[in-house]
Amino acid sequence: MVLGLRSKIIPLPDHKLGNIKLGSVTNAICHRPCRVRCSHSTASSMEEAKERIRETFGKIELSPSSYDTAWVAMVPSRYSMNQPCFPQCLDWILENQREDGSWGLNPSHPLLVKDSLSSTLASLLALRKWRIGDNQVQRGLGFIETHGWAVDNKDQISPLGFEIIFPCMINYAEKLNLDLPLDPNLVNMMLCERELTIERALKNEFEGNMANVEYFAEGLGELCHWKEMMLRQRHNGSLFDSPATTAAALIYHQYDEKCFGYLNSILKLHDNWVPTICPTKIHSNLFLVDALQNLGVDRYFKTEVKRVLDEIYRLWLEKNEEIFSDVAHCAMAFRLLRMNNYEVSSEELEGFVDQEHFFTTSSGKLMNHVAILELHRASQVAIHERKDHILDKISTWTRNFMEQKLLDKHIPDRSKKEMEFAMRKFYGTFDRVETRRYIESYKMDSFKILKAAYRSSGINNIDLLKFSEHDFNLCQTRHKEELQQMKRWFTDCKLEQVGLSQQYLYTSYFIIAAILFEPEYADARLAYAKYAIIITAVDDFFDCFICKEELQNIIELVERWEGYSTVGFRSERVRIFFLALYKMVEEIAAKAETKQGRCVKDHLINLWIDMLKCMLVELDLWKIKSTTPSIEEYLSVACVTIGVPCFVLTSLYLLGPKLSKDVIESSEVSALCNCTAAVARLINDIHSYKREQAESSTNMVSILITQSQGTISEEEAIRQIKEMMESKRRELLGMVLQNKESQLPQVCKDLFWTTINAAYSIHTHGDGYRFPEEFKNHINDVIYKPLNQYSP
């Protein structure tokens, strides 16, 4: 059995794989030609795109924020309250009104009307305060009149703190004698709701709840305790890295040299506008690295990514304010650092360990859904049973929170999809399936939202889209060619004559291609897929067809190997199976010798002997003689017959790095292999228990129930196995990410994790081999259907 599966050889019907004709790949699934070659101009264009992407590291800019720029424009001069301190911001506002009279990121976006209303009103306040731009003011009022319906529309994406800030700006407009064309009843309702929100916050200030509205301090106006607020001023002079809030402190409180210095430093960078958050370096670099990984092209920028993560790690160790003052930054930094082999402690996330504490001590900036999503993602990378209990608690409350949010019928579709994806275990998905979905949903006009919507030029651009799409299609072309090779091999080995459908090739190859997808790993990928087919086939034979004597015959043939002709074949199916095995191992051994510079064939043969002898134990002692093994006895055998030692250790030789005999036989490799095999076996046993019970096959669930003498129910047995499985999974991830004293190259350690990822992925929606329709869609997406998001 392979990848945690003990599957019957059930042919997938032709209609389930898009009427595949086994003799012609051009008719397979999507009816597209197999070979696609890139022109010289295309290759050159992609190289140029790659260089432009490389240049974006450290140079990413956020879009101008009309909202924040307007607040900065309202700051009076330190020398005269009747003059603006930053007149250049007023000039920017005058020059950047949209044709419809609005200001904002994208007034035509159907879900950003509230954002446009907020930015427009802030801009009108700045113009009216300094008595300029009468024409622009009238046009802006016209926009508010025609779009005022969105103020209380629950289907709109709302800027953070809108319910506090927008009514405050309405009050300010009245003081400036700016008559807003809004429904008076709606205005009164908003003002009442704002007062109640502020009253609750001020009443519970000493209990921590005031933190919920501090980020929206410009919406508190004179009600804000600005003197106390200034105690939260950051080293860079800002309040919460927000230009708008910092500007409000200068408007409502008093002149502060550090606040002025902060705003002035931003304007030195951008001349006459400000973004909605600054500084942006850590923010932008984290999101860029995450985007590159999600797009599946981070391998092209290893040097740049490492440079960014090294810098983030240095700042992490220094407890840098820009990282730790923002929960989304902190959570994302933790996840990216841990998953890229940096040693980081989950104790740094202790402040977010429960929902109530999070919402009563976090500023409003931290409470947007992005922060919750990033916290949940960070909680999934636990590697310590005891040390990472903090992550378990975070995982529980963030999942519950998102589940409740998903019940809200007004939740924007964009947020809904993000939450649904975040709630899926990151180790229970096929990488290339998710990469395709990410590319398909990638939009150059994508935005994020704080108190104003914003976009990042370096993260949402045409180069990233074109480059990732081109790379996906190149890999896809390679996969189609490899699948053709697999089909020729399958036919040459006559495996159909022993009951194995050729259509099984698609699923077997897809499982590894969807995770170990890089072109340079073609040899390892093909070996892995072939082993998957042969191991699953022999396992099913022994379960249902082959007698004990035939298995003993196969073992003797493998033990003799070069002298197999002196042994003879007990049956035709034994002959077909052994010759397929022999040809496969000989071919792989030759390739491995070329890559390793030494002969490893004896090791490959011994791996098969060990597995076959363990299969004999399963067949003879446990099935024929109905002996029930102890848990220890069962795992010592079943973790070998699952196939992990055989196909993973074999594939290691083909990944590229040279591995000495000492490394292969090291305790590190042994521990990785044992842990991987245990997880794969336990995954298999949980999902195949009912079927194996009907077949009288031994299974971990049945052993626990039997040994308990009726004191453990089936549900309890499965719960205990899941606990064992989770413990082993974390242990494995910890070993894979551990750099200290590791002899094994990272790409080799990753293959063990890849194997577990595949096993979990297969069973995410049940036994993948028993749900061919879903796998048909996955195979189409990863191997056959080209991406075409970008249309030049």
Swiss-Prot record:
Name of the gene encoding the protein in the UniProt record: ABS
Origin organism lineage: Eukaryota, Viridiplantae, Streptophyta, Embryophyta, Tracheophyta
Comment text on domains: The Asp-Asp-Xaa-Xaa-Asp/Glu (DDXXD/E) motif is important for the catalytic activity, presumably through binding to Mg(2+).
Protein name, as recorded: Cis-abienol synthase, chloroplastic
Chain segment of the transit peptide: 1-37
Pathways per UniProt: Secondary metabolite biosynthesis; terpenoid biosynthesis
Enzyme class: lyase
Tissue expression pattern: Expressed specifically in trichomes.
Protein source organism: Nicotiana tabacum (Common tobacco)
Renumbered ranges of motif DDXXD motif: 539-543
